[in-house]
Amino acid sequence: MTADTSLRPADHPAVKSGKVGVLLVNLGTPDGTDYTSMRRYLREFLTDRRVIEWSPWKWYPILFGVVLNTRPRKVGKAYELIWNKEKNESYLRTYTRNQSELMAEHLKDLATVKVDWAMRYGTPSIASRIEALKQEGCDRIVLFPLYPQYAAATTATVNDKAFQKLLSMRWQPALRTVPDYHDDETYIEALATSVEKHLATLDWKPEMLLASFHGIPMSYFKQGDPYYCQCQKTGRLLRERLGLTKENFMVTFQSRFGPEEWLQPYTDKTVEKLAQDGVKRIAVINPGFVSDCLETLEEIAEQAAHSFHENGGEKFAHIPCLNDGEDGMTVLEKVVRRELQGWI
């Protein structure tokens, strides 16, 4: 719906309105693998109070005194292993841009809808893309944090950043935030199909399928974060859809950081133990990641595979994320069309 301009004064400034924006938001990515780019990205990420809930008086001396002086080089080297050399960017940026472009194509029947993308950390920022959508005439925006399972350290911090931008705007767009979809049947079916398709390309059958989710500190869970429960439900629904038993399917948690206890069982320890216990063939899927990134391509496909082989395992397969494939886009489109109801 477009505003009636016939009643405007002759000197009224041109104003665009009547559009609906869809903003896809993922975690973030450094602009490069060099020390400066990595430090800038890690500083923004690790100063987020949703990510590290310690008091700044306790955390900042460690962060600025140690972590930001040593970790950028280490993480930069890891990114170099999985960097998209063709586009000179991380694959997370590549896939998120592709998802945005494909979503726009899928929604071309909705003439008033504009689709864009942003990153919580790094560029393009959430604030810049909300501003761009507003300038394009979007007086309503669907904000889509690309996380199937809700966590304060992921979904909530995306929402926080969007709300922070709105605080600075005189003419705020209406904002609708997308909830989690951890038990959506289309999402579960897409995960199951990706497992079946990938395993069909192998000449061996895994004895164990791990569903590895990003971890969070146990203290966050105990304070009421629903993430653990949602991961477990996703895992159970996927196991049931694949017809597997608890003896050949496990939910595990990866990417722990710092001295705190995190959600368990830990993926890295589980992979080691499986190999040490005589399991020779395993496959790993990352249901909580919409797109492949450092945590899947390097931590699982490289580090976990190496650990499994070093401890006696023989066959290891990493099942790619849904990324910008047809099944993955079907999931995202379903969620977006559902959340657009009443606005189009």
From Swiss-Prot:
It holds the Pfam family Ferrochelatase. One of its GO terms (biological process) is heme biosynthetic process. Its EC number is 4.98.1.1. GO terms for molecular function: ferrochelatase activity; metal ion binding. Keywords: Cytoplasm, Heme biosynthesis, Iron, Lyase, Metal-binding, Porphyrin biosynthesis. It catalyses: heme b + 2 H(+) = protoporphyrin IX + Fe(2+). Coiled coil: none annotated. It is an enzyme of class 4 (lyase). It comes from the Bacteria. Gene3D superfamilies: 3.40.50.1400. GO terms for cellular component: cytoplasm. Pathway: Porphyrin-containing compound metabolism; protoheme biosynthesis; protoheme from protoporphyrin-IX: step 1/1. Its main location: cytoplasm. CDD domains: Ferrochelatase_C (cd00419), Ferrochelatase_N (cd03411). It is found in: Cytoplasm. Fe cation binds at H214, E295. Catalyzes the ferrous insertion into protoporphyrin IX. Belongs to the ferrochelatase family. HAMAP family: Ferrochelatase (MF_00323). This is Ferrochelatase.
